[in-house]
Amino acid sequence: MSETQKENPYSSTVLLPKTDFPMKADLAKREPAQIQSWKSGQIFRKMKEQRKGKKEFVLHDGPPYANGNFHLGHSLNKIVKDIIIKSKSLAGFYADMIPGWDCHGLPIEVQVLKNLGKKARETGPEELRRLCRNYAEEFVGKQGEDLSRFLCFWEEDRIYKTMSPGFEAKIVEVFGELFQKGYVYRGKKPVYWSIDLATAHAEAEIEYYPHVSPSIYVKFPIVGEQKKFCLIWTTTPWTLPANLGICFNRKIEYSFFKTESGEELILADGLAESVTSTTGVSLNKVKSISSDELSVLKFQHPFMDRISISLFGDHVTLDAGTGCVHTAPGHGQDDYKVGLAAGLEPFSPVDDYGKYTDEFPLMQGKKVFDANPEIIQLLKDKGLLLHHSEFEHSYPHSWRSKKPLIFRATPQWFFKMDFNELREKSLSAIDGVQWIPSWGITRIRSMVETRPDWCLSRQRNWGVPIPAFTCESCGQTHIDDVSIQFFTKMVREKGIEIWYSEKAADLLPPGTKCGKCGSDSFKKGNDILDVWFDSGVSSFAVLGERKDEPPADLYFEGSDQHRGWFQSSLWPSMALRGIPPYKTVLTHGYVLDEKGHPMSKSLGNGIDPTADVIQIYGADILRLWVSSLDFRDDIKVGKESLKIVSEQYRKIRNTFRYLLGNLDGHTSEQNLPFEELEELDLFYLSKLSQFAEDVIANYEAYQFHQIYQKLILFCTVTLSQDYFDMIRDRMYCDARNSKTRKSSATALQYILETLCILTAPILSFTAEEVWVSNGKKDSVFLQNFPDLKFWKNQNLEEKFESVLQVREVVQKALEIARQENKLGKSLEAGLEIVSKNGTNLTKILPKETLEILFVVSQVHEKNPGLDVLSFYENEKFSVKVLKPVQVECPRCWRHTEDISKEGDLCGRCKSVVG
């Protein structure tokens, strides 16, 4: 208010907004107390108990690794899950989510070894496992604190950890059931192998980075021929010692090509020009050679006393190389398959640490990548190297060590993808799952269609042991249903440490004998299960079973989980249940910096959700930021974008504050019945109904960014700019118990309660604070989304909207008058409004209502001779701003005809003041 009004003798009679709800949020300071209030009041538990017997909605939480603090991506993931659970609960569902943590595996073991430093070499396996368990427990606690701070609702005594004895036992049990049904086998196949970590890797543990490899063209001499060779191309010279054949494609045409030196080379016709371009060697076609002729050829290995045979496979293409593919069944998936068909055993003269064994004595003990230059020199010395250059390409690396991987054949435990038509059944089931975004189905289908058998075993310390034994007499592997069940019971009681603390005989049922030789002497295996198998069986360990339908309604994780958790969860569920574990799969993109780069400590571009957001702005700002994102795509974020969201929050908070202030002295019990409400208030309740309907639909579709946009628009335009402006006069100047004021107060009460409930899943702290400030005793989370369809009034909306389209023209006309210093407050103005199509606005709404809508003192169909202050028109209406002849009421500032002289009150204000 102006200084003039402060001195106004009537200022104390004006009902200005009054509330203890602070304009300054101070969220960072206030929120912890609210968290304690929710915990002590057991609100989450009550929320679920209140909805027992209602339709169930289960969101299965994908477990993050228990290492390191939560980053912004974790925050996004967990907050979206929290929004979903709360919105489903408010929609009437029995909604539940049990937070979980992935506690075994390489990420934790490697970090513990790193922390040990030089002491790592002195640390035994038992002590290492103890340290890993302690480390995981520590970060479950730390991440749990983060979770409480921004997630709000979860029960700390109701979580799952993959290292708990019950969960570990379920892992062994599911492995046993899969083994019993024939899905698990032991075999020697090429797998991704980390020579730095000395263990196999699953496809989900692989990252691709640019890598420079040697590109060489090698001549394999044809046995029994002079100066005739088969030309192969490879970027892995180190695999040549394991070469057992050369692979062709029967659909490709091959020929002998003569070089300038007189040598003849076999290669694909379609690649001759490319080879010449790359190598600079001129090639002249001599004659074609058929597939039958190729099949009988044998080739001398370039530097081993061994013959390589002809093979055929559809994986050979004309995309690159020579069309003649160097084949080492021990070092490649396609190589293994064609070799298996030809009866070739996978041969890999490389040990766990990537060093050649005595099977390649020439370079025994040398690391394979270090051997590349020596092998190239060896080929050059023998005159079998046609060309050598460097080749940059995308190459698989370990997700943990960030070092290049190799393909290496080792004895491993595998899950059969094609047993019992599992792949076909899984693809069919995928079609029945709802994938959001829709492209998710294409991504996972392509991966499931081509995925090789899943390598389940790892050669590390920290994980669930595979309960397999080896007969000490004959070397036969022993594992069966009885032994697995026996061991499962032991794990359930004492955890996986029992595998290491007990002798083999004590881990097997009494009387166990080798099925091959009858011996009762066994030794324990050293393999542990892939950590992806741990999380993959979480639907069995954590969720209840439902008859003939998936146990989870929703999985929500990053889009990288199409090749990770979504698959590792799918396979066991399809094999044992015959259905997928989820009905719907929703994914989010990566959180990137403002320039689209991944966030990292080394780049210094990260945003810490606790230090940079919660401790400065509060958790509700972080939650509002998450809701503002279309998280289905990658998300760019910087500190500036958080400031913008903070500003938008301030507008929302001020809307709540204005509502509370105007409701001072008015409670829900004082609301007027529907039939007594003013048309203007009914119109905005109709708009509230549509707003609520849209928001609830957006929650249902997980389109929270649209809720954010609608909320900002509703608060800043529909309410603050329009409705609050229109009813300010009656709320401030009408008698407290007047029908018009109570009508608007009733509408404001409905708006406040509805906004509180609708925003609670996102602005959880603020919504609860407002709810309590409005005198409510129970939590906002014990309410339901309101059904406001009865407020919907299409006829009333059409009626008001037809008039409100003039409001924009009026405001522009008023602004012109202000800019020309002819007008201060809009109440100092009268209006002449002329419709160019002949519409008479006073026939649609009473003149008094039009004055309220336009926030002016008078509205005329025709200027009664008043001075014109400004003029504005569009194609439908023309508006003149007029200067009223009446003086201003000193209390309400309106210029009305019932004021006799300056300083007198208008009739309405006289009756109020008395």
From Swiss-Prot:
Keyword Nuclease in the entry? The reply is: no
Residues where ATP binds: K601
Instruction: Note whether Metal-binding occurs among the keywords.
Output: yes
- Transmembrane stretches, start-end: none
Q: Which Pfam families match?
A: Anticodon_1, tRNA-synt_1, zf-FPG_IleRS
Question: According to the lineage, what is the superkingdom?
Answer: Bacteria
The Gene Ontology terms for molecular function here are: aminoacyl-tRNA deacylase activity; ATP binding; isoleucine-tRNA ligase activity; tRNA binding; zinc ion binding
**Binding-site residues for L-isoleucyl-5'-AMP, renumbered to this chain:** E557
Q: What class of enzyme is it?
A: ligase
- Know anything about its domains from the record? IleRS has two distinct active sites: one for aminoacylation and one for editing. The misactivated valine is translocated from the active site to the editing site, which sterically excludes the correctly activated isoleucine. The single editing site contains two valyl binding pockets, one specific for each substrate (Val-AMP or Val-tRNA(Ile)).
Protein's UniProt name: Isoleucine--tRNA ligase
The gene that this protein is the product of is ileS
